[in-house]
From Swiss-Prot:
Belongs to the paxM FAD-dependent monooxygenase family. Glycans are attached at N54. Induction: Expression is positively regulated by the oosporein cluster specific regulator OpS3 that binds the promoter at a 5'-CGGA-3' motif. Expression is negatively regulated by the global transcription factor Msn2 that binds the stress-response element 5'-AGGGG-3'. It comes from Beauveria bassiana (strain ARSEF 2860). The lineage of its organism: Eukaryota, Fungi, Dikarya, Ascomycota, Pezizomycotina. FAD binds at E37, R112, D306, A319. InterPro entries: FAD-bd, FAD-dep_Monooxygenase_BioMet, FAD/NAD-bd_sf. Pathway: Secondary metabolite biosynthesis. This is FAD-dependent monooxygenase OpS4. Its EC number is 1.-.-.-. Residues 1-22 form the signal peptide. Gene3D superfamilies: FAD/NAD(P)-binding domain.
Length: 427
């Protein structure tokens, strides 16, 4: 009679999208998972995000996608305009149908809180031990354990995942000599949510929100993006422009008149949206140099999401790539049952994921360059190429519709990639 195989135990530090993805994926493979979130509860924080087919196919696999449909903005069009609204540079009609038919998965716009709530519910339903108010005080790399603040509880695992975000304390503990403090990029973001019910006095603006589309305005050192969430009942609007926050300040309440002055002369329709903003915060955009490694030398600690590869938002891949991380890690762990093989799994995980996310981060910087061009010969050449579609031999100025980059981004199947790695490395 064969012996019963005991499941491995994954301890996840951080209840964001990377941590939740890893927890769900690992439970679906039959292993145990404990997820530690230091906040006392999962509050409605954040704003909009864009779920591209590389992540929605994962959410479908995990049994989450259908729970989100009523909360999604499903855009039928993606448009890029000159900042002043004088010219449409690119327009892709039937965006929802194109994404579904080309990638067999949808492109949805979503409020982060709705996505997180659905993933927390799914994780709990699957049996993940989700703990809130659980702050990690220290880690024991020799014993593969974490010690919780306050109670001093020692939580033993077989493998530990640091998914505690850009300002990860776990990263600093694992790699104290790397000098991994995030650095300012020189840009900031105004993040705005406008409710449809508050725009009824302007039928044109209300119609924009009620009929979900994705819209970019591109200008000198700045651009704006707007899309509907929550079934077309809210508009998520983000303004990206040069950073003027004081040193040491990462987030602050913004002055409305200052914000409007920054975008004076832009598309009158965009400015009308800004006239309806009652309060707004501005967030400093941070980045971090590529890390030489994600795995601790012990072989039993690794990282995912912003804790190891924060990326700028110009391709909207931060959340999507974090979910890819979790999917790959969970699938790879599903291929083993002995804790002694975890170092091999983590080595494959790092090899698979690191090269992809580093390329995405570089492509996001390219997108920033192309969307923030000042008026002049380069901008005129960009506009001409975009409007005449004479970009076939190289990457498009807008990677959102680029026939080279879009399939590489959206066609990625994290589960298939992990399965291929298992077959090729004989994990």
């Amino acid at each position: 009679m064969g012996s019963i195989r005991e499941p491995l135990h994954l301890v996840v530090i951080g209840g964001g999208l990377a941590g939740l993805s890893a927890a769900i994926a690992t439970r679906l493979e039959g292993h145990r998972c404990t997820l530690l979130e230091k906040a006392p509860e999962f509050n409605e924080v954040g704003a909009g995000l864009q779920l591209t087919p590389n992540s929605t196919r994962l959410l479908r696999r995990w049994g989450v996608l259908d729970k989100l449909r009523s909360k999604a903005g499903i855009p039928t069009q993606l448009t890029v305009r000159r900042y002043d609204g004088s010219k449409v540079l690119s327009r892709a009609d039937g965006w929802d149908e194109t994404m579904q038919s080309q990638y067999d998965a949808p492109f949805w716009d979503m409020h982060r809180a709705d996505l997180q709530a659905a993933m927390v519910a799914r994780a709990r339903h699957l049996g993940v031990d989700v703990r809130t108010g659980a702050e990690v005080e220290s880690i024991d790399t020799d014993g593969v354990a974490v010690i919780l603040a306050g109670t001093r509880e020692r939580l033993q695992g077989d493998v530990v995942l640091a998914a505690d975000g850009l300002w990860s304390r776990t990263r600093a503990a694992l790699f104290p000599d790397l000098g991994t403090a995030p650095q300012p990029t020189g840009d900031l973001a105004y993040r705005i949510i406008l409710r449809l019910e508050n725009l009824q006095h302007d039928p044109e603006l209300a119609a924009w929100v009620a009929k979900p589309t994705v819209n970019f305005w591109v200008g000198a050192d700045a651009h704006a993006v707007a899309y509907s969430v929550r079934g077309g009942s809210e508009l998520n609007l983000v303004l990206l422009c040069p950073d003027d926050l004081p040193e040491g300040c990462a987030r602050a309440q913004a002055d409305l008149e200052e914000m409007r002055a920054r975008f004076q002369g832009w598309d009158p329709l965009l400015c009308r949206f800004l006239d309806n903003v009652k309060t707004v915060e501005k967030w400093r955009l941070m980045h971090m140099p590529s890390l030489p490694k994600w795995n601790h030398e012990s072989g039993y600690f690794t990282m995912a999401g912003d804790s190891c590869h924060p990326m700028l938002p110009y391709l909207a891949q931060g959340a999507n790539s974090a979910m890819e991380d979790g999917a790959v890690l969970g699938r790879l762990l599903g291929s083993i049952h002995e804790a002694s093989r975890i170092p091999d799994v983590l080595a494959v995980y790092q090899e698979i994921r690191k090269v992809r996310v580093e390329k995405i981060a570089k492509q996001a910087l390219k997108q920033r360059y192309n969307f923030h061009m000042p008026d002049g010969p380069l901008q005129e050449a960009r506009d001409e190429a975009m409007t005449t579609h004479q970009q076939r031999e190289e990457e498009y100025a807008s990677q959102w519709t680029c026939p080279i980059m879009q399939p590489w981004l959206y066609g990625y199947d994290a589960i298939a990639v992990a399965d291929s790695a298992v077959a090729n490395t004989k994990l």
